[in-house]
């Protein structure tokens, strides 16, 4: 009788543990809050854009990033950024200093490495240059021809800078080691465990 009760209690404990740890999630709001905090504490975050022939040498300072999660196409992370871009542009043999506000938008997937969540496979969907000066027009024309290089620079940046770290409490830290899959849903990231 006692053995039966012990087995029943052990089975119940295992069931409760497994059902409580089947998945964990991070909401879009939590993700955006973490990104905003990271941008505040780790500035300046600069993405360098340089062409081999040195016609362009720009630094992109990330001021703001807003993340929108969607289930579309198997799960996407859509990011709208506000940045300041500054540097030099060589036009007709003349170096021209420039500064403008650049607002790129892109979509990507996610990967987890240890306890860090990274954006992967960033694909630009839109780039807006704010302003209407001559240098802004030249920047628009130059960026149009630099689409692939700009996309690669964004992808490289987010491949090494996590957007979220699973370290907010002991349960999150422990669960991070057991994540087997990530599912992007509308408004949350689900971490599948076991």
Predicted segments — roles?
Residues 1-9:
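Bacterial N-terminal signal peptides that target proteins for export
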Residues 21-194:
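Extracellular/lumenal and peripheral-membrane lipid-interaction modules
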